[in-house]
């Protein structure tokens, strides 16, 4: 048996070598590390496009009056595309597709993912999906104007009768394909984690990042089919005369909102849970301590995932639901703060008494804890139906979810990037450049989004191209912040270029005694086929 395993290993090595020598190696590779790298490159490209759109939005809002988007529908298209791109083509491919594919098999001691060829198509569906979304901006949406400008939520009737052209149809197909990609990926992750752990690695010994990916995969598997159903009904309403969401045919536009948010709320937890997992590893590594309350951390994530499915209507307080219904959703939403608080305090307890090293990944992780907490506090404010009466669809909501996404998920992605970059590439980045990137984006995004709380409380509504002069001051501050953040993206790309240009080699484990998971026992970068003899976990 040992001989055959070794022989198989040699054969696999040769195949892996050919794969990279061949010009189509990247395209056809079924290796989880190659696919993870493709996901990360795709996420960076999509992120730059999405960030460019947000810069255009903030440039327009810098001063009152319509300045750049003289075709005002185009502004709505930018807002819509920015949202869809950042969620479906940047955060999800980076966290789940990128870091998930790269490190989940390494962490659990698996030779690869359970279904490597399915993994390949999970990735390649995404460029197709992205292409459809970009195509939608070049065909008619509203009469006489190109592109889908219904918001990333695509609420009816704006996305049905409000957009008679084919743009929204293309956007719907784009979401279908992105959803198919995520469902296939989720099946792959669940199977891999349940069936391919190294001998001795029970579920309760599994690294927290692996747990976060498992829970995220279940959320994807349960929520995406609901989105698929909703947008398919929207498609038939638009093209085939059905009236699922059209009152004149006995339909209900609120049904769309319920279906959408039944997907949409688990989705925002899908966007942050893998980040929780990454942050746990980074805090533990740079505090030189095991995570405080491991089991509590696992079940807190599971509780967040479960509760995420029963709070969706807190996005809909103003649609006229029954008061008892609203009371339920207020209470359920606030209960999610409990497991989230367990995680925050466990991270702080992990650092307590630790030998903390403020390396770049640790800076991102510390900023994540602070800024995610700010986003959580404004979330508790918005959970109150009575307050949401006033704050719904104002910039207060924009500030809230950008604090948990732009200053939460993105900070977690960058934390993971700087933490694992030496392992993925075999090179060390320039610490000074990396810290400059951190401080620049930290100042930038806080300048953008903190003042937006004030705008929201003052009553400035979201998704408008123009605003009364009274809101000019904080909008100027916000837009200046977006220029700083935009520059930080360029610095990040230069930082990556610099690391590959300088070629500073790195050992198996650049982080020292704090890094205890299996990937740090492998060379940097790992061989094409790791774990030919499965590791045994004690």
From Swiss-Prot:
Topology in the lipid bilayer is annotated as: Multi-pass membrane protein
- Which residues are Fe(II)-heme a-binding? 82, 402
Which family does the similarity line name?
A: Belongs to the heme-copper respiratory oxidase family.
Query: Which terms does the UniProt entry file under GO BP?
Result: electron transport coupled proton transport; oxidative phosphorylation; respiratory electron transport chain
Q: Which InterPro entries match?
A: Cyt_c_oxase-like_su1_dom (IPR023616), Cyt_c_oxase-like_su1_sf (IPR036927), Cyt_C_Oxase_1 (IPR000883), Cyt_c_Oxase_su1_BS (IPR023615), Cyt_c_oxase_su1_dom (IPR033944), Cyt_c_oxidase_su1_bac (IPR014241)
The metabolic or biological pathway listed in the UniProt record of this protein is: Energy metabolism; oxidative phosphorylation
SUPFAM superfamilies the UniProt entry points to? Cytochrome c oxidase subunit I-like (SSF81442)
Q: Where is this cross-link: 1'-histidyl-3'-tyrosine (His-Tyr)?
A: 265-269
Annotated region Disordered: where?
1-27
UniProt xrefs under Pfam families: COX1
Question: What species was this sequence derived from?
Answer: Rhizobium leguminosarum
Q: What does this protein do?
A: Cytochrome c oxidase is the component of the respiratory chain that catalyzes the reduction of oxygen to water. Subunits 1-3 form the functional core of the enzyme complex. CO I is the catalytic subunit of the enzyme. Electrons originating in cytochrome c are transferred via the copper A center of subunit 2 and heme A of subunit 1 to the bimetallic center formed by heme A3 and copper B.
One GO molecular function term of this record is: heme binding
Annotated residues for binding of Cu cation: 265, 269, 314-315
Asked if the keyword Iron belongs to this entry, the reply reads: yes
Entry protein name: Cytochrome c oxidase subunit 1
Where do the TM regions start and end?
Answer: 37-57, 84-104, 121-141, 170-190, 208-228, 259-279, 291-311, 329-349, 362-382, 401-421, 438-458, 476-496
Residues the entry annotates as binding heme a3: 400
């Amino acid at each position: 048996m040992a001989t055959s395993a070794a022989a198989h290993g040699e054969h696999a090595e040769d195949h892996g070598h050919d794969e990279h020598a061949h010009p189509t190696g990247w395209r056809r590779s079924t290796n989880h590390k190659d696919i993870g790298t493709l996901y990360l490159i795709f996420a960076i490209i999509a992120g730059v496009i999405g960030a460019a759109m947000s810069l255009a939005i903030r440039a327009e809002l810098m001063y009152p009056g319509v300045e750049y988007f003289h075709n005002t529908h185009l502004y709505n298209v930018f807002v819509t595309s920015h949202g869809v791109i950042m969620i479906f083509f940047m955060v999800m491919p980076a966290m789940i597709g990128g870091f998930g594919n790269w490190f989940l098999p390494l962490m659990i001691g698996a030779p690869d993912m359970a279904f490597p060829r399915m993994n390949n198509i999970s990735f390649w569906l995404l460029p197709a999906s992205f292409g459809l979304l970009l195509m939608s901006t070049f065909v008619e949406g509203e009469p006489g104007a190109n592109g889908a400008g219904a918001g990333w939520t695509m609420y009816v009737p704006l996305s049905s009768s409000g957009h008679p052209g084919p743009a929204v149809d293309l956007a719907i197909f784009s979401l279908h394909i992105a959803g198919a990609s995520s469902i296939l990926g989720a099946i792959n992750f669940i199977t891999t984690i349940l069936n391919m752990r190294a001998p001795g690695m029970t579920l309760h010994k599994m690294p927290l990042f692996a747990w976060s990916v498992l829970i995220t995969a279940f959320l994807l598997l349960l929520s995406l089919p609901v989105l698929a159903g909703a947008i398919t009904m929207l498609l038939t309403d638009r093209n085939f005369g059905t009236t699922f969401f059209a009152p004149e045919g006995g339909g209900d536009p609120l049904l769309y909102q319920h279906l959408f948010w039944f997907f949409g709320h688990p989705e925002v937890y899908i966007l942050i849970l893998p980040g929780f997992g990454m942050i746990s590893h980074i805090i533990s590594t740079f505090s030189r301590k095991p995570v405080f309350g491991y089991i509590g951390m696992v079940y807190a994530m599971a509780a967040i995932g479960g509760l995420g499915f029963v709070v969706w209507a807190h996005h809909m307080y103003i649609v006229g639901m029954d008061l008892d219904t609203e009371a339920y959703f207020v209470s359920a939403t606030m209960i999610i703060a409990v497991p989230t608080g367990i995680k925050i305090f466990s991270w702080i307890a992990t650092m307590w008494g630790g030998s903390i090293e403020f390396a770049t990944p640790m800076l991102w992780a510390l900023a994540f804890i602070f800024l995610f907490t700010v986003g959580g506090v404004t979330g508790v404010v918005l959970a109150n139906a009575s307050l949401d009466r006033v704050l719904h669809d104002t910039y207060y909501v924009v500030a809230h979810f950008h604090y948990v996404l732009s200053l939460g998920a993105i900070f977690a992605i960058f934390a993971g990037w700087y933490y694992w970059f030496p392992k993925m590439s075999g090179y060390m980045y320039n610490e000074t450049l990396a810290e400059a990137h951190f401080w620049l984006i930290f100042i930038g995004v806080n300048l953008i989004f903190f003042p937006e709380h004030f705008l929201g409380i003052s009553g400035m509504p979201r998704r408008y191209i123009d605003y009364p002069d009274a809101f000019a001051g904080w909008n100027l501050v916000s837009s200046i912040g977006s220029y700083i953040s935009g520059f930080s993206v360029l610095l990040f790309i230069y930082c990556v270029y610099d690391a590959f240009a300088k070629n500073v080699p790195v050992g198996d484990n650049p982080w020292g005694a704090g890094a205890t998971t299996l990937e740090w026992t492998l060379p940097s970068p790992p061989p094409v086929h790791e774990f030919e003899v499965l590791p045994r976990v004690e």
